[in-house]
Amino acid sequence: MMLEGKVAIVTGAGGGIGREIALAMALAGAKVVVNDIGASLTGEGETSATPGQQTQAIIEQRGGQAVVNTDSVSDWESAKRIVKTAVDAFGKVDIVVNNAGILRDQIFHKTSPEEWLAVINVHLNGSFFVSRAAAEHFRAQGSGAYVHMTSTSGLIGNFGRPTTRRPSSASPRCRSPSRSTCSASVCAPTASPPSPGAA
């Protein structure tokens, strides 16, 4: 299997695309950290471990291994705990899929600073925080892969979604002993080894 022996963190894996990515990685042999705060699509309201537990149950029913983490990507200390969950449960981390996102449907002149910052904190800061927390492990083991998700709202815009355009189009570009290749609306890890002297 392509990902046999690998450990993957998938943020926003309690449902939708994130769940499908987590399931696909598990089917390919990876052990998966299912990260999801279990809130609404807007990121508001009560949080719950249930969505993540449902993804975990499907993976385990299919013979895979997974653990659930409910920390938020939008906070540095929280993001470090997400990576720590992988290391504590499976001994390492090989793949980070930055999929977590929230939605604020609002036309620009009605978007509040709080709405703007909420999206920036999840989409942009969250991608940086989780990637940065994993980067130290990637450097130490000399390998790793990032997958950064975006949407058509981030690439070409969408009426009523000004908060999504900027953070999605500003996904991190990384230069480390890991690789990430971005094209169209999905980013996928490359199979090439790190170039000598990559910083």
Regions found by a protein language model. Name each.
Residues 62-65, 85-98, 104, 143:
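A glycine-rich helix->loop->beta "capping" turn
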Residues 131-132, 176:
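A short, exposed helix-loop element centered on a Lys and neighboring polar residues
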